[in-house]
From Swiss-Prot:
DEAD-box RNA helicase-like protein required for pre-18S rRNA processing, specifically at sites A0, A1, and A2. GO terms for molecular function: rRNA binding; U3 snoRNA binding. It comes from Aspergillus terreus (strain NIH 2624 / FGSC A1156). This is U3 small nucleolar RNA-associated protein 25. It holds the Pfam family UTP25_NTPase-like.
Length: 723
């Protein structure tokens, strides 16, 4: 059974998934790859394996009106005509030329008809065939690359091996004794930790016991980064300088340390994306260059006893986890801008299926919403990229790819198929750099997919996949790859689930660093013309597991009883307009059922909007709440994440729990000011939010870092009011 999307409502208009296209064997040569952006048969119908070519050609031939023999004769005639055209003098008779051209056009038409018919068949293929194509196990074509490398030896951007290069010290030639000692410390959970605060950013660095947990100097540019020669000029142009939070994080990124960054914004996302693209591309090129050099060396010194440990079990080395196809397009654009390939195979197909225009109706939406959902926001995708010296190939099979870019759902679907025999995650066995961007958005989709993927990284493969074990690095064979792998995660804010990744999955012997901002608090940045009373009520909760029950009890006995009295007593004065915001969907269902069945709320009219509510019901609930027919509206945080509607008619906001995203707090409190004539009255209703000691992370983002300490030290039942 395929894993659930778990992403709330149906996606926006641009987010529909394009039909899966099967590889077609019509165009088998590389002649059309010279101009990747030109419209060609090779772009629209990517090349496949020989067996697929023959099968597809036979299918097209069955549908054509001519027989197989006639097709063969037509093909022979076409070749003869080409030879004739080459041999014919340009000054020959015009009548003869017209006859040749007519025959040539006729043969071309036959082939074009076959392509069109093949395209119609491709559109009918199901997702299972796309999965099979992605996982098609081909032997890595290193021989082809090696021949190309040898033929272009003069142009090879060969770099001398530098012992100070983190790639050398961390991956290629680590000191065995030091590596063993650090792995033992990591497995024993013995870390040395240091902390510091700088420029509104709190840094926590941890290294295995025995190493010094000092902080690296800031990085203002890429001048001292050990980049491949091919990337040095382009990287300097794309990233002329490094500033802001990036200058504190870049040293750890290029040093192959694990990084958790919890202050991602729309403004700093672009420079961080370029830095990570440079790092990922640099790692791929260095890895491939080392393999190709050793291939040539092994071929020249066949009698020598060489110990060439330069590989993992499988070829893919970099994994990107991204929230949408458009996010994937942005990453690929950064990579191609740095790599500047002479050819980009299947680029047109990539843009056609992954990119889309922005929805102009979203101009009034917040910038973070537009960044996440603009363009093609489909969250079901996966893409393999293969690098050669001058080419990037899109839609490469995973086992011949150097880099995999995917959504958690798209990758989980291929790893966790209904048929146990088809499940496969061996292509993740040798991943050395993992980049998870916009992790907070991934959590709103389905965090279980992210967790599943991370737990299946760097496991021992079930099959050999053509691996030359004599060239596998020792720490792969010892099942220690997870301690050398680098994991980089960027998020707009830190949640307990993201913190769990830092604790459980970031086990790098080079160390790890976590960066979180110092928060001023969303309560001080409300979009209202008047001050509003904001009350935070703390309740006792013994454990995270018991927190939902304690929260529900406190809400029904303390908060809801007061609301019922206020609304009932003020019915003649048109009281109501109570918006109850509920972060968790499970809590939402529980509260909704209580409103529907409890005698306590029998006299209240209410509406409910969640991420699973049908659009027609959403419109009806909003309308009834705005005109007063519903005095209470239950509203889920995930719905707000996916839609960002402005709810009118709000006179009081009650937060069943503090929202994870601090921006949502300000936006929802801002609903009080949508009606300018009633803004003063709405401000009197104010805001009331419930919290427990387990809400410390999200409470800090709302009330601010300085206020958090006192609120966490007080006992349950205490109330904190801010104006």
């Amino acid at each position: 059974m395929a894993p659930p999307r778990g992403k709330g409502p149906k996606r926006h208009a641009k987010g529909s998934r394009a039909p899966v296209k099967r590889k077609n064997g019509f165009a088998t040569s590389r002649l059309d790859e010279v101009d990747s952006d030109a419209s060609s048969a090779a772009d629209e119908f990517p090349t496949g394996d020989l067996s697929e070519n023959e099968m597809d050609h036979e299918e097209a031939g069955d549908d054509a009106s001519d027989s197989e023999e006639e097709d063969l004769n037509a093909g022979q005639s076409y070749n003869e005509l080409l030879q004739l055209l080459q041999a014919t003098d340009s000054k020959g008779p015009a009548r003869k030329k017209r006859k040749v051209e007519h025959k040539e056009e006729k043969v071309k038409k036959l082939k074009t008809d076959a392509v069109v018919e093949g395209a119609e068949e491709e559109e009918k293929e199901e997702e299972e065939e796309a999965v099979a194509n992605d996982l098609e196990q081909q032997e890595p074509s290193d021989e082809e690359d090696a021949n190309l490398d040898e033929a272009n030896a003069d142009e090879q951007d060969s770099d001398t091996e530098d012992g100070t290069d983190p790639f050398e010290s961390h991956f290629a030639n680590p000191k065995e004794a030091d590596l063993t000692k650090k792995i033992q410390a990591v497995e024993a959970k013995k870390w040395t930790t240091a902390k510091k605060e700088t420029e509104g950013l709190r840094l926590v660095r941890s290294v295995p016991e025995g190493a010094e947990a000092s902080f690296l100097p800031t990085m203002k540019s890429l001048a001292n980064v050990k980049l491949k020669r091919k990337l040095q000029t382009t990287a300097k142009d794309a990233i002329p300088s490094i500033s802001g939070h990036a200058q504190h994080l870049a040293p750890y990124v290029f040093d192959y340390q694990d990084v958790l960054y919890g202050a991602r914004t729309t403004s700093n996302a672009v420079p961080m994306r370029d830095i990570l693209a440079a790092h990922a591309t640099n790692h791929v090129l260095k890895t491939r260059d080392r393999v190709l050099k050793n291939n040539l060396r092994a071929a020249k010194e066949q009698d020598a006893d060489l110990d060439l440990r330069d590989q993992g079990f499988t070829r893919p080395k970099v994994l990107y986890l991204l929230p949408s196809k458009q996010a994937c397009v942005r990453v690929v654009e950064s990579i191609t801008r740095l790599f500047q390939p002479e050819q980009q195979e299947n680029k047109k197909r990539f843009l056609d299926t992954f990119s889309a225009e922005d929805d102009v109706s979203w101009d009034n939406k917040p910038d973070d919403f537009r960044e996440l959902f603009a363009g093609n926001n489909d969250d079901m995708f996966r893409l393999g990229l293969k690098f050669t010296r001058k080419t990037i190939k899109f839609f490469a099979q995973f086992y011949t790819s150097d880099m995999i870019l995917a959504s958690p759902l798209g990758l989980r679907t291929i790893m966790d198929q209904a048929d146990a025999k088809k499940r496969d995650h061996d292509f993740l066995s040798s991943i050395e750099v993992v980049i998870v961007d916009h992790a907070d958005a991934l959590q709103m989709q389905n965090w279980d997919h992210v967790d599943y993927i991370l737990k299946h990284l760097n496991l021992q493969p079930k099959e050999a996949h053509g691996c030359d074990f004599s060239r596998v690095r020792p720490w792969y064979l010892d099942n220690q790859a997870r301690h050398v792998r680098q994991l980089i995660m960027l998020a707009g804010f830190i949640t307990p689930e993201i913190n769990s990744v830092y604790s459980a999955q970031m086990q790098n012997v080079a160390g790890k660093v976590k960066a979180t901002p110092v928060y001023e608090g969303a309560i001080s940045e409300l979009p209202l013309p008047v001050s509003v009373k904001q009350t935070f009520s703390r309740f006792d909760s013994l454990s995270p597991a018991k927190d939902p029950d304690a929260r529900f009890k406190h809400f029904t006995t303390t908060v809801l009883s007061t609301l019922v009295r206020q609304i009932t007593a003020g019915r003649g004065k048109h009281r109501g307009g109570v918006l109850i915001v509920i972060p968790s969907y499970l809590d939402f269902v529980r509260v909704r059922n209580h409103f529907a069945t409890s005698a306590q709320t029998a006299n209240l009219s209410f509406g409910a909007i969640s991420e699973y509510t049908e659009p027609r019901e959403v419109a009806r609930a909003r309308s009834h709440f705005m005109n007063g027919r519903h005095s209470v509206l239950l509203y889920s945080e995930r719905f707000h994440h996916f839609r960002r509607y402005q709810i009118r008619g709000v006179r009081q906001v009650v937060m069943y729990g503090v929202p994870e995203n601090p921006r949502f707090y300000g936006e929802m409190v801002g609903f009080l000011g949508l009606d300018a004539a009633a803004v003063v009255e709405a401000a009197e209703g104010g805001v009331r939010a419930l919290f427990s000691k387990w809400d410390a992370l999200k409470l800090e983002r709302v009330v601010g870092t300085k206020r958090l300490g006192n609120m966490m030290r007080e006992r349950g039942g205490d109330t904190f009011t801010f104006v």
